[in-house]
Amino acid sequence: MRVFRRFYQVQLPPISKFRLLPQYKLKCGLEIHTQLDTRNKLFSMSTNDPFHSANKPNSHTSFFDIALPGTQPILNHEAVLFATKLAIALNCQINLDSQFDRKHYFYGDQPLGYQITQHFSPFASRGHLPLHKDIDGIDEISKNIHITQLQIEQDTGKSLYRKSDHITLIDLNRSNVPLIEMVTEPDFQDLKQIRAFIKKYQNLVRHLKISTGDLETGAMRVDVNLSINDHARVELKNLPNTSSILNAIKHEYLRQVQIVEDGMADELLSQPETRGWTGSSTVKLRSKETTIDYRYMPDMELPRITLAADVVETLQKTMPPLPDKILNTLMSEPYKLSLKDAKILCLSSNGQDEIYNHEELQQFYLDTFHSYADRVKGNIEANKLSKLPTNWIIHELLGDLNKLELPLSEITKVLTPQIFADFLMLIHNNEISSASGKLLLFHVLKTLKETNCDTSTTIDFNSLIDEFDIRTINQIDHDELREICNEIIETLNNDKLINDIVTGKKKKSIKFLVGQGMKLSQGRIKAQDFERTFKEVLDVKW
C-alpha cells in the first residue's frame, strides 16, 4: 500500500462544477491575522506603515525590530486598546490578566529567533459573531460563528527572493507590526457562511478603525482549516484574497471527497497536514510528522497585561453602534432603506484614497433626510420620505463625486445637508425636473472643485435655475404639447416602434418617446405630461 500511495494521483473535476455533497459533510474553521493600524509597532517606537514603505525596505526599523542584542520590548498600549475594542465587538470574554509568550523558530524574516505571541493565556476567548439571512445572505435564518480566542502577537519581516541573483532579501519594515490572531470554531458548513463571515469581519475591523482590513496588502490574512466526515484536519495557507480562499476550499473539498471514494482515506486523511494554494490546486507543505516544536515559554521581559474591569465596561458603553445595528436602523422607520442602499452607508472602505468614508456619508444622509423630512411632513406618505434623499445622495451625488474625484468632506463645507435639502425641495415641488436637477447638481459640484471648495462660495439654486432657464413649465398649452409629440413621432419615422407601443407588445418603449420629449424641452416639461400626451396622441388603450 505504501508504494501505491507514492504513485497515487487524485483526479478532480473542475471547481466550476463544485457542489457540496450531502454524504460528505464540510467542517471548516478560520484563523485570521489582522494587522493593527496603530501609530507605532507593537514593542518599539518604530513607525507602523509596512504597506506604504514597501518601496523603502528597512526604513521603519528600530534596534529591537532587528533584534540587536540588549534591546528590550516596550508594549504599545494602543494595540491593547484596539484588541479590547475587537474583543467587545466579537462578544468575547476578555482575560483581565493575559501574558505574552515566546514561540521559537528560526527563519530569516524573524531576527529574534522567536515570535512574541500569546499561547498559554490569550487576550480574549469564547466569543461569537452572528450571521443573518436577511443581512449576510446565508441560507439559515441566523447562525453564530463561535470565536475560540483572540491573541495579540507581532508580525514577521518579509522575505523577497531575487531570482536573477539567487538570493533572498529581508525587509524588516513589517517586523514587530502588531497583529491580532482570531481563531474560530469549526462552525462553517458551506461557502456562503465563509464568504459572509470574512466580509463581515473585514467590515467590522474597518468600522472600528483598528485595521485597513485589506487582504491584497496582507493587512488581513486568512488560513483555513477543513475536513470532511470528521477525517483529519487540513490547514490551507497562501490565500491572498477572497476568491483564492473560496477556490482553495472547493479544490480541497473535492480532493478529499475523491480520496474517500478511492478508498485511500486511511492512508491520506488520517493525519493532519498543511497545504498551500498555488492558484489552481493545493499542494502539501508539511504533515504532522514534520510539525515544528515551537518550545513555547513565557516571555520574562514583558509584564502581564492587567486590565481593570471598569475600564472594559466604560469602553463597552462608549463604543459606537456596530454595523448590524446601523443597518437595522436604516432599514426601519422612518428611513426604510433597502438592504443594498443601507449597506452603501454602512460598508467601510480601507481608508486609502477614498472619496468618502461611511461615517461622513451616514451623517450627511441623516442630516439631509431630517432637514428634508421636516419640510415635507404631511405632504408625502411616510414610506416615501426617503425616496428623494436616497436617490440623490447615494446614486447621483456619489456618482458625481467619483467622476470629479471630489471628496465629500470638502464639498460639505459649502454644500451642507440643509442646502442639499433645499435642492431636493426644488425637485419635490416640481420647480425643476430630475433631468435638469442632474445637470444643475453636476454644475454646482464642478464649480466647487474649480474654486477648491472655497467656504466663501454661496450656492443659490434659484438664481442658477433662472440663469440656465431650466425651471419646469407647469402650465403648458395642451395643443402645443400635442404638436411637440406629433413632431417627435414623425421625426422618428419608426412604424414598428409605434405599433409595439400601441399594441402593448413593448409598453416600456413609450419611455423612449418621453426621453425624446425631455431632451427636446431641455427637461422643462414634466415626464408625466409627455407620457400622458403620447398615449393620447397614439390612442393607447392599455
Swiss-Prot record:
PANTHER family: GLUTAMYL-TRNA GLN AMIDOTRANSFERASE SUBUNIT B MITOCHONDRIAL AND PROKARYOTIC PET112-RELATED (PTHR11659), GLUTAMYL-TRNA(GLN) AMIDOTRANSFERASE SUBUNIT B, MITOCHONDRIAL (PTHR11659:SF0)
Keywords, comma-separated and alphabetical: ATP-binding, Ligase, Mitochondrion, Nucleotide-binding, Protein biosynthesis, Transit peptide
UniProt record, GO biological process: glutaminyl-tRNAGln biosynthesis via transamidation; mitochondrial translation
Subunit relationships: Subunit of the heterotrimeric GatFAB amidotransferase (AdT) complex, composed of A, B and F subunits.
Presequence positions on this chain: 1-66
SMART domains: GatB_Yqey
Family matches, as PROSITE patterns: GATB (PS01234)
Domain of life where this protein originates: Eukaryota
Molecular-function GO term, any one: glutaminyl-tRNA synthase (glutamine-hydrolyzing) activity
Family statement: Belongs to the GatB/GatE family. GatB subfamily.
Enzyme class, UniProt record, top EC level: ligase
Main localization category: mitochondrion
Annotated EC: 6.3.5.-
Organism of this sequence: Zygosaccharomyces rouxii (strain ATCC 2623 / CBS 732 / NBRC 1130 / NCYC 568 / NRRL Y-229)
Catalytic activity, reaction form: L-glutamyl-tRNA(Gln) + L-glutamine + ATP + H2O = L-glutaminyl-tRNA(Gln) + L-glutamate + ADP + phosphate + H(+)
Subcellular location: Mitochondrion
One of the record's GO cellular component terms: mitochondrion
HAMAP family, per database record: GatB
A matching Pfam family: GatB_Yqey
Name by which UniProt lists this protein: Glutamyl-tRNA(Gln) amidotransferase subunit B, mitochondrial
Function: Allows the formation of correctly charged Gln-tRNA(Gln) through the transamidation of misacylated Glu-tRNA(Gln) in the mitochondria. The reaction takes place in the presence of glutamine and ATP through an activated gamma-phospho-Glu-tRNA(Gln).
